[in-house]
């Protein structure tokens, strides 16, 4: 819980419904990318993203994911719990609004969430629409509340079923075979990889994943628990664990530039391959975008300026390029953007122009500071 806690109230009226979800089932690929393996696993990410949003807001530090025997998924967190009070505009419980209205959620109310992930906000309602069944259990204000759905439609009104000292949200859903006709079985390794990734991106948050479909020879289910103390520095070390590092420590920075939180970690190894990863609000932007272009530009300009001023390029007979500086580089760039603009429904490329300048400035300052500590000198290949 190392992010600034939102001071304003997170209540039923924080939930804003933007539009219906009638055509989600007719055109699911518009919302989750495809109806194959990628889309199937994306359902899990959407639900977990809600828990991560609670972590970003400073209200959650434990998240669990369980693959059940029937290939349904259960996620649970210790956040505030989705509000269950009556939504003034919709006239039903805010929980039902969140679960049945596309684009409904506290993430659209910036008093509740400063930044958030999720697939363009379609989130858990999209998961609900594409599930044969879904059950939401809310632990909030001393009570336990629940509601079940069938292919996105409530089976009954939100009801109180008991008392509790816990707080948080639990969701169990089973993907609909009418939608996912080719694949319904979850791949543990795919989900595990994403949970590990999220733990690095959100240091201090404990994320567990358990597979209850099969026991090992000792009668135990496969389970992993991820929790990172150093965040991206640890992430880079994990990615580079099989490579020989040519600088002593991972170079890193964390700060805010032009109102945009930026975190960068990088290291050089003895290979000649470039290994760059970029994230926006915990979303893996596989196709990069303005944050990655800003990183490349800032890095190239700073290192080239240093190399020229130190005379390292005097004897070169060719023009050095950014590619030369990125040989053997493993780096991660992570930014938090209040209003991210993505190219494509599946969030693979960031389009915000202002992010490029922020990241470029951040990496320039980081490298200038590290140059003075002389750690970068040992990585020079010119």
Question: What does each model-found stretch correspond to?
Answer:
Residues 61-67:
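A conserved short beta-strand within the histidine kinase catalytic ATPase domain
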Residues 1-48, 97-99:
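Bergerat-fold GHKL ATPase/HATPase_c domain
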Residues 38-61, 123-130:
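Conserved ATP-binding N-box helix of the HATPase_c
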Residues 2-13, 71-94, 105-230, 235-238:
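GHKL-type ATPase core
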Residues 376-382:
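Single conserved hydrophobic/aromatic residue that forms the stacking wall/gate
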Residues 17-25, 68-69, 162-172, 264-280:
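Flexible hinge/switch segments at interdomain interfaces of large molecular machines
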Residues 189, 196-198, 204-345:
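GHKL/Histidine-kinase-like ATPase module
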Residues 171, 322-375:
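Extended, well-ordered alpha-helical scaffold/bundle regions in very large, multi-domain proteins
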């Amino acid at each position: 819980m190392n992010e600034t806690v939102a001071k304003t109230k997170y209540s039923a009226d924080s939930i804003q419904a933007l539009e219906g979800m009638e055509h989600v089932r007719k055109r699911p690929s518009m919302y989750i990318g495809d109806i194959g393996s990628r889309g199937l696993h994306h359902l899990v990410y959407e639900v977990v993203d809600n828990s991560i949003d609670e972590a970003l807001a400073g209200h959650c530090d434990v998240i669990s994911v369980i693959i059940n025997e029937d290939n349904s998924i259960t996620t649970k967190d210790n956040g505030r719990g989705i509000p269950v009070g009556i939504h003034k505009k919709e006239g039903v419980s805010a929980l039902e609004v969140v679960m049945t209205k596309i684009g409904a959620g506290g993430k659209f109310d910036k008093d509740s969430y400063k930044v958030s992930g999720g697939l363009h906000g379609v989130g858990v309602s999209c998961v609900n629409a594409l599930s044969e069944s879904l059950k939401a259990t809310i632990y909030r204000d001393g009570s336990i509340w629940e509601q079940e759905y069938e292919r996105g439609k409530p089976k009954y009104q939100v009801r109180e079923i008991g008392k509790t000292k816990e707080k948080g949200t639990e969701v169990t859903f089973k993907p609909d075979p009418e939608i996912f006709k080719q694949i319904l079985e979850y791949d543990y390794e795919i989900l595990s990889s994403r949970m590990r990734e999220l733990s690095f991106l959100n240091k201090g948050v404990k994320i567990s994943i358990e597979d209850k479909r099969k026991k090992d020879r000792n009668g135990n289910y496969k389970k992993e628990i991820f929790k990172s103390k150093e965040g991206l520095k640890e992430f880079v070390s994990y990615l580079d664990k099989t490579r020989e590092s040519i600088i002593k420590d991972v170079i890193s920075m964390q700060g805010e530039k032009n109102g945009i939180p930026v975190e960068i970690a990088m290291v050089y190894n003895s290979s000649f391959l470039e290994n760059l990863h970029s994230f926006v609000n915990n979303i893996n932007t596989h196709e990069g975008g303005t944050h990655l272009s800003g990183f490349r530009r800032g890095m190239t300009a700073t290192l080239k300026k240093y190399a020229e001023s130190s005379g390292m390029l005097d004897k070169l007979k060719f023009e050095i390029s950014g590619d030369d500086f990125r040989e053997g580089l493993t780096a991660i760039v992570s930014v938090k953007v209040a209003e991210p603009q993505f190219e494509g429904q599946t969030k693979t490329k960031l389009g915000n122009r202002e992010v490029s300048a922020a990241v470029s400035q951040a990496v320039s300052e980081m490298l200038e500071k590290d140059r003075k500590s002389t750690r970068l000198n040992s990585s020079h290949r010119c």
